[in-house]
Amino acid sequence: MEQINHEYHMEGILIKGRVRYKDSCPVKGAIVILEKLVPIYNEEVQEQKYEGTYLEHGLTNDQGEFCFSISDRMSSYKIKVFDNHHR
């Protein structure tokens, strides 16, 4: 699958992308999950990790495209993609 693109807007961030197979065919109906990365500090080992917190999900269209709108520009996010059809 292909890397995700992003665009920046004044009021927030619009994240949109296209999911494709290695042969460039679009992945139709793939589940796309948006997570906000929340820092978790482990006192015992004095290490900070990030845990994903679910925000929303969607499905890719016939061209393999998806889109999310985010208002919190100061946070980090993770996008997970799952192929429903297992081509």
What are these regions (language model features)?
Residues 8-10, 59-61, 72-74:
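Surface-exposed coil/turn segments at beta-strand junctions on protein surfaces, enriched
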Residues 22-49:
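Short, ordered, surface-exposed loop/turn motifs in non-cytosolic proteins
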Residues 40-65:
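Short, acidic Ser/Thr/Gly-rich low-complexity loop/linker segments typical of extracellular
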Residues 1-28:
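Beta-strand-rich domain onsets/edges
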Residues 14, 29-31, 76-78:
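Exposed beta-strand and adjacent loop surfaces of beta-rich binding modules
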Residues 85-87:
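Short acidic/polar inter-strand loop motif in beta-rich domains
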Residues 81-83:
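Conserved structural position at the C-terminal beta-strand
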Residues 67-78:
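Short Pro-Gly-centered beta-turn/loop motif in secreted/extracellular proteins
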